[in-house]
Amino acid sequence: MSAEVALVYRVLPESVEVDIEKLKNAVVNKLAPKYKVDKVEVEDVGFGIKALRFFIRMPESDEYSSDEVEELLRSVEGVGSYELEYFSRLSF
């Protein structure tokens, strides 16, 4: 069995006006065809701003990359910024 890679991205919306649930769904839908989103957490940042934390799993393969995940995040309307918080190889 091949190993997998776990990624955790923290995503901030462009502004406080962005609907956080719509943004969450848009990101999940953009990633879902290829990447497995295990969990999404909503975090209060302050001043009415909420951040989203995406827990993503992907096979360890040349066909998958964090660069591609970041390209997909950039392409979602409403995403202001993102940060890779965690990257680890999983093997069972």
Curated annotation (Swiss-Prot):
Q: Does the keyword Protein biosynthesis apply?
A: yes
Keywords tagged on the record = Elongation factor, Protein biosynthesis
Provide the disulphide bond pattern: none
Instruction: Show the SMART domains listed in the entry.
Output: EF1_GNE (SM00888)
**Pfam families registered for this protein in UniProt:** EF1_GNE (PF00736)
Keyword Ligase part of the UniProt annotation: no
| Gene3D superfamilies listed in its UniProt record | 3.30.70.60
Q: Indicate the family of this protein.
A: Belongs to the EF-1-beta/EF-1-delta family.
Q: NCBIfam families, from UniProt?
A: PRK00435.1
Briefly, what is this protein's role? Promotes the exchange of GDP for GTP in EF-1-alpha/GDP, thus allowing the regeneration of EF-1-alpha/GTP that could then be used to form the ternary complex EF-1-alpha/GTP/AAtRNA.
Q: What is the protein name stated in its UniProt record?
A: Elongation factor 1-beta
